[in-house]
């Protein structure tokens, strides 16, 4: 190939090296249902091997947002890929779907093979943990679109659930219990505000906060809920689920509730990670608003019948997940969420 393409700002040799570096990580994620290998124009997956009677495909796409800016600024690229996978698979999990495969999209000013490898390693680690095949992706070098050193990461996940097992919130009733699964921290939402508060505070991100460097706290990857929730679903009838992302409690919990019902949440029933206290104090933010921005320590919720709540908590504990009975379902025609203690 002529040098014209390279002179326009695209280094195809760096692209080849990045592909070579990521190949071993991608291969770790393969499932038996994947047909063919890497490098084709389209990735293929054999649904017939799932042994499902009436599979419904569920898809979701998301990115990591401005959390990427922190990772880029401090040269920590190994966990951002986990965030990209978690944001997608946790979303489709709310329908009861088992994630099957994932595709990534990385766009950058300049392909740096070592950085791309770190990102894809994180993606692959999350895919292995959730038994999700990384069957395809795209790495785009676009020097005119991004500043030097910058990149963006997004993903697309597809899962499947038996049609009769699809969870859509239609069976939610008064008296059912809301169980909250602990988050690992901020996860991947609210980072425009987080970065603003970091800049205003003037803190050294290498300094310690709660026995860890600030930067590690801020870049803690989003928790993956796939394994524990699928284990729970095998044993307990789940009526609705929510992934607590952008918009916090106020925007996410109502998404799975039928009209005329509300989730009454006791905010004193679960611990709030200290980093949220720091953010609230630094920004002088009202508590009510914090629950409209952040997950506040609960990254995922499931709604079950009251009689099943103790068993559900036991199963989640066996899956090494911190979980709490944080509320219950009530009748309410005017609002879909009631927060007590704010």
Swiss-Prot record:
Catalytic activity: 2-formamido-N(1)-(5-O-phospho-beta-D-ribosyl)acetamidine + ATP = 5-amino-1-(5-phospho-beta-D-ribosyl)imidazole + ADP + phosphate + H(+)
Pathway given in the UniProt record: Purine metabolism; IMP biosynthesis via de novo pathway; 5-amino-1-(5-phospho-D-ribosyl)imidazole from N(2)-formyl-N(1)-(5-phospho-D-ribosyl)glycinamide: step 2/2
Enzyme Commission number(s) from the entry: 6.3.3.1
Alphabetized SUPFAM superfamilies for the sequence: PurM C-terminal domain-like, PurM N-terminal domain-like
Single GO MF descriptor: phosphoribosylformylglycinamidine cyclo-ligase activity
GO biological process: 'de novo' IMP biosynthetic process; adenine biosynthetic process
Keyword Nucleus part of the UniProt annotation: no
Alphabetically ordered keywords of this record: ATP-binding, Cytoplasm, Ligase, Nucleotide-binding, Purine biosynthesis
Gene Ontology terms: cellular component: cytosol
Enzyme class name: ligase
Pfam families in alphabetical order: AIRS, AIRS_C
Subcellular location: Cytoplasm
Xref: PANTHER family: TRIFUNCTIONAL PURINE BIOSYNTHETIC PROTEIN ADENOSINE-3 (PTHR10520:SF12), TRIFUNCTIONAL PURINE BIOSYNTHETIC PROTEIN ADENOSINE-3-RELATED (PTHR10520)
HAMAP family xrefs: AIRS
Family as reported in the entry's similarity comment: Belongs to the AIR synthase family.
UniProt protein name: Phosphoribosylformylglycinamidine cyclo-ligase
Species whose genome carries this gene: Staphylococcus aureus (strain MRSA252)
Lineage: Bacteria, Bacillati, Bacillota, Bacilli, Bacillales
